[in-house]
């Protein structure tokens, strides 16, 4: 099946959030299932120094009163075809922000639509977040192309109707209130990045004012869990770590813990409970909860805390003040450093994710992969990926709390600290977390089924037997599977959708 991914990010070249990881890692997993997968993204200025891009474009087009060029290259990690939309508006190295952000991404969506109509027509055009939200609207008139829209974060919804009226030729009645709403209305399938988040966004608490619309389209909405690249994130072969290790031999973690304590200016002590956090420092991630419980936690336990990330100025300043007030026990690094992030995953005893909401979350998967036990709030994808630790039955992979309240978070932290003191049980907990399977191969099977469903192809993938070891059901919402709110359109396509 021909599948075109359209997104504003793609790891490792352009990555701001989890969407970049998905767009960089899911396509090669789908290619293993015999899909012809290609990617298209804005031609940001930085890409010309990172990729081998031919001087001459493969095609030139015009849309929204502007000319653009399409350049073809390949993804540096997986070799899949990668198309770049060339236009001066993408020349600056910034990805998001700026007064022209709405116009830039609406233009990218329009150029992608022209590319799909004139250069390489996919059977499935897979769009990601509001930046590509107008593509399902424009492609809806083409019965040969099915559209899938993935919600990575419902909070970011794109330009409102009055802006779209001025930027595009699209009539008002096809736009919804904003770009996100338009995509939800016109995409043939919509998926969130975890089953729990797919259910949560249909409620007023998490629906970001779109819960009514999401309930209306619930027949085509489902949740598919994100995965991680098990080869890229492998503690047994990670060259950035001072010492490698595996679930069978955790001895290297002690070396990494010492290196992490030294690098972050903490007191070096192998018996101290070391907590790590790698995150955008924003309201969503629960940084305010951490600020409220840190002083008490440090006063009553022998814990240390390290934080890596950037974000809101106020939160950065508060974390910096905590570090000044608690030298040797609390350290913050206000930047993003991939090697340091890996050291935190591979050297910390536990990993903090007290999120206000969490569509899926990648960090908890990486933490478990590296033996750092997650302490998380029961929300979104954290519910689907971190079962609560039960010392009696020896099940679970982390410590969970329900309410977004300091007392709940503090209680979970103390429970984890007490468990850490029982080293044999803690080692078993680490090993159980490290052996969880959250590979993209498993998630790809669910996407494969969704593609086939939307195109009217019910037979399994030719190579599905190769990956039968992965559970088809886990990572998706069974109640959503096979539902179709647009049966007539699917019937028209059925005779056209061939591999």
UniProtKB/Swiss-Prot annotation:
Residues 488-499 have a biased composition (Basic residues). It is an enzyme of class 2 (transferase). Residues 471-485 have a biased composition (Polar residues). Disulfide bonds: none annotated. It catalyses: [(1->4)-alpha-D-glucosyl](n) + ADP-alpha-D-glucose = [(1->4)-alpha-D-glucosyl](n+1) + ADP + H(+). Synthesizes alpha-1,4-glucan chains using ADP-glucose. This is Glycogen synthase. It comes from Prochlorococcus marinus (strain MIT 9303).
């Amino acid at each position: 099946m021909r599948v075109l991914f359209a997104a504003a990010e793609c790891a490792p070249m352009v990555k701001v959030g989890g969407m970049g990881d998905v767009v960089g890692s899911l396509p090669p997993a789908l290619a293993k299932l015999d899909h012809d997968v290609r990617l298209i993204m804005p031609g940001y200025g930085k890409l010309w120094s990172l990729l081998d891009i031919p001087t001459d474009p493969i095609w030139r087009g015009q849309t929204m009163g502007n000319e653009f060029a399409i350049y073809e290259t390949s993804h540096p990690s997986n070799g899949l075809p990668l198309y770049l939309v060339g236009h001066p508006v993408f020349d600056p190295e910034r990805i998001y922000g700026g007064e022209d952000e709405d116009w830039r991404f609406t233009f990218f969506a329009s150029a992608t639509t022209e590319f799909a109509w004139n250069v390489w027509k996919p059977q499935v055009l897979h769009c990601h977040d509001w930046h590509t939200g107008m593509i399902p609207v424009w492609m809806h008139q083409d019965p040969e192309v099915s559209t899938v829209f993935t919600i990575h974060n419902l909070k970011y919804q794109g330009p409102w109707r009055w802006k779209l009226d001025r930027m595009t030729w699209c009539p008002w009645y096809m736009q919804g209130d904003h770009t996100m709403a338009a995509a939800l209305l016109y995409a043939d399938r919509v998926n969130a990045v975890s089953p729990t988040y797919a259910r949560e966004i249909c409620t007023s608490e998490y629906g970001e004012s779109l819960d009514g619309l999401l309930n209306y389209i619930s027949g085509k909405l489902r949740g598919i869990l994100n995965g991680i690249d098990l080869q890229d994130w492998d503690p047994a072969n990670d060259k950035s770590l001072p010492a490698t290790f595996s679930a069978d031999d955790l001895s290297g973690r002690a070396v990494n813990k010492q290196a992490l304590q030294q690098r972050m200016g903490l007191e070096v002590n192998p018996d101290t409970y070391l907590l790590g956090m790698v995150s955008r420092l924003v309201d969503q991630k629960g940084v305010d909860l951490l600020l409220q419980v840190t002083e008490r936690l440090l006063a009553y336990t022998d814990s240390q805390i390290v934080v890596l990330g950037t974000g809101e100025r106020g939160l950065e300043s508060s974390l910096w003040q905590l570090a000044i007030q608690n030298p040797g026990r609390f350290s913050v690094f206000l930047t993003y450093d991939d090697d340091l992030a890996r050291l935190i995953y591979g050297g910390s005893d536990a990993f903090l994710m007290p999120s206000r909401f969490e569509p899926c979350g990648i960090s908890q998967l990486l933490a478990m992969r590296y033996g750092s036990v997650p302490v998380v709030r029961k929300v979104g994808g954290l519910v689907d990926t971190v079962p609560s630790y039960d010392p009696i039955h020896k099940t679970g992979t982390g410590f969970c709390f329900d309410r977004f309240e300091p007392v709940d978070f503090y209680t979970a932290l103390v429970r984890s600290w007490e468990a850490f003191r029982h080293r044999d049980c803690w080692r078993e907990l680490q090993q159980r977390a490290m052996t969880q399977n959250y590979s993209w191969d498993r998630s790809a099977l669910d996407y494969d089924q969704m593609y086939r469903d939307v195109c009217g192809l019910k037979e399994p993938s030719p190579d599905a037997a190769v990956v039968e070891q992965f559970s088809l059901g886990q990572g998706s919402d069974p109640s959503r599977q096979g539902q179709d709110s647009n049966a007539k359109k699917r019937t028209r396509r059925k005779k056209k959708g061939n591999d």
